[in-house]
Design a protein with these regions (language model features):
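Catalytic His-Asp segment of secreted/periplasmic serine-dependent ester chemistry enzymes
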Residues: 394-485
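Extracellular fibronectin type III
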Residues: 158-177, 263-279
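Conserved aromatic anchor
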Residues: 81-92, 199-210
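Recognizes extended acidic, P/S/T-rich segments that occur
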Residues: 100-146, 218-249
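Oxyanion-hole/transition-state-stabilizing segment in secreted/luminal serine hydrolases
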Residues: 302-305, 313, 331-370, 392-395
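Active-site segments of SGNH/GDSL-like serine hydrolases
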Residues: 352-356, 377-411
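Serine-esterase "nucleophile elbow" of acetyl-processing enzymes
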Residues: 266-326, 336-345
Length: 485
């Protein structure tokens, strides 16, 4: 799911520390304490029921409501023999389980799979599914207005444990007169001001049944307008998403489309529609965010940066462009500065990187040197740098989800780097999410590293609460730098 650029260590031992007590002592004299209190107060309004509905994996004992908004059909409004079925997304779901029935059972449990189901799958990682009905429904039933197929869906956690009941059975009427799904359906859409413009896009779509792989082509001109247009980049994947490893920016839009291939490498239908996105320095972005996957977006294992509820930038009260790249170490972020930041020349650059380096055992002095290098180059180019402290992590959850160990002394490493950050103009993001025993709680970050939607909302609200003060400090620092030249 995330770029595998991270350096690894060879041993793991989770150390329990009383970090909370240390943070409380620091808060007494913390210069952003007022902003923190304001931020916590405003969360009641900003988050409301979001925090109340936070769940641990499968801790709801199936009291959480089942998926809703399932695709509705009637004999008069049928779908094709290869339909796309959808339901309302659930930010707490990692995957979904779907069952199909050729007859409506008289008795069926909402908490257990049914032996009467003719087809069942758990390989559903989004709130949409292209059902291969012709593989498990008799031909004389398909298209029969008096004999619909039935289906239901439930949400599962990372371990495959149900945390919601199955939905009610929904009839699925079909018609031979409707075209089958013949191409992927694109879902990612970029270009908005609320963290919705990414220098490193993630392309996502609804996949076709029986597709073994996908090809994504990116163009500098619309291939539907100019059929001879050649792609500037071609990506391949076996999943219904792919992270672009290359930055894309221009005063003109970019275009992308996807097609499927079967197991023999033959095209499985047609190209998808063409979708465009614009990432332009000409749009005069005043605020940019530079960092790793925590800022790039995504979380809860299945959600990519294309799902903006998993981006803390999406919750900001001001426009910002996302220059972050998943998988970055602090060194990688520093190396990208001239290529990825200077073309946009934002007035303010929010910088949060180093978590991947420190948890892998990188020397703290090296991370601090990378941050200082970025900070100095900002000032030299008339950009106001704003460093961001690193939130806590949860090594056991990182190991469970990513099978990656964490440096034994990660807390000391994070504390040392955060101490450096607090000597400059900074946002104390480490204070944004409440910790438990010094670690990032599972209820805010399933994978122990990337805050989920509720955690990202907390981060955005905290930034909003301190932004006027931090912005003024950044202006003052820039003026002092200019006066000293």
């Amino acid at each position: 799911m995330y770029n595998e650029k991270r350096r690894k260590v060879t041993s793991m031992k989770i150390m329990k520390r009383r970090y909370e007590r240390k943070l409380r002592e620091k808060m007494k004299s913390h210069k952003h304490m007022t902003g923190l209190l304001i931020g916590l107060s405003c969360l009641i309004v900003v988050l409301g029921g979001l925090l109340l509905s936070t769940r641990h994996e499968a801790s709801s004992q199936l009291l959480t409501p089942p998926p809703a908004g399932l695709s509705a059909t009637t004999a008069e409004t049928p779908l094709s023999y290869s339909p796309i079925l959808t339901w309302q997304t659930d930010d707490e779901a990692v995957m979904y389980e779907i069952e199909f029935f050729t007859k409506k059972p008289e008795h069926i449990s909402s908490s257990k799979i049914s032996s009467q189901a003719v087809f069942r799958t758990r390989s559903v990682y989004q709130n949409a599914y292209n059902a291969p009905l012709e593989e498990f429904v008799e031909a004389d039933q398909l298209g029969n207005p008096n004999e619909p197929v039935y289906w239901r869906v439930r949400a599962l956690d990372f371990n495959g444990t149900p945390y919601t009941p199955f939905s009610e059975l929904v009839p699925l009427y079909t018609s031979p007169n409707l075209p089958r799904m013949n191409a992927p359906v694109l879902t990612a859409e970029y270009g908005g001001p609320k963290g919705e413009t990414l220098l490193y896009p993630v392309y996502t779509w609804i996949g076709q049944a029986n597709a073994a792989s996908y090809e994504v082509d990116i163009y500098a001109e619309n291939p539907e307008v100019n059929p001879d247009a050649a792609p500037i980049e071609t990506l391949t994947t076996t999943m219904a998403e792919i992270y672009d490893p290359e930055p894309h920016y221009s005063s003109e839009p970019f275009y992308w489309r996807v097609r499927s291939f079967d197991g023999e490498g033959q095209p499985l239908g047609d190209w998808s529609e063409v979708r465009s996105f614009r990432t332009s320095p000409d749009d005069n972005w005043q605020v940019a965010v530079l960092g790793d996957s925590i800022s790039h977006g995504g979380g809860h294992y299945s959600y990519s940066p294309a799902v903006f509820s998993f981006s803390w930038l999406h919750y900001l009260d001001f426009p910002s462009i996302n220059l972050s790249e998943s998988g970055d170490t602090s060194g990688m972020t520093a190396e990208r500065f001239e290529r990825d930041v200077l073309p946009f020349h934002p007035a303010y650059l929010i910088i949060m990187t180093g978590s991947n380096s420190l948890r892998a055992g990188e020397d703290t002095d090296a991370v601090i040197a990378d941050l200082e290098s970025i900070r100095q180059r900002c000032l030299e180019n008339g950009i106001r740098p704003i460093l961001v402290t690193l939130p806590a992590i949860h090594p056991a959850n990182i190991e469970h989800v990513f099978d990656e160990p964490t440096a034994d002394d990660w807390e000391d490493r994070f504390e040392a780097v955060n101490a450096y950050i607090r000597t400059h103009t900074y946002i104390d993001m480490a204070m944004a999410i409440p910790t438990k025993d010094g670690e990032l709680p599972t209820q805010y970050a399933l994978d122990g590293l990337h805050p989920d939607a509720n955690g990202k909302a907390l981060m955005g609200a905290y930034v909003n609460s301190v932004w006027p003060e931090v912005k003024a400090e950044a202006d003052e620092e820039m003026q002092e730098y200019l006066d000293a030249q």
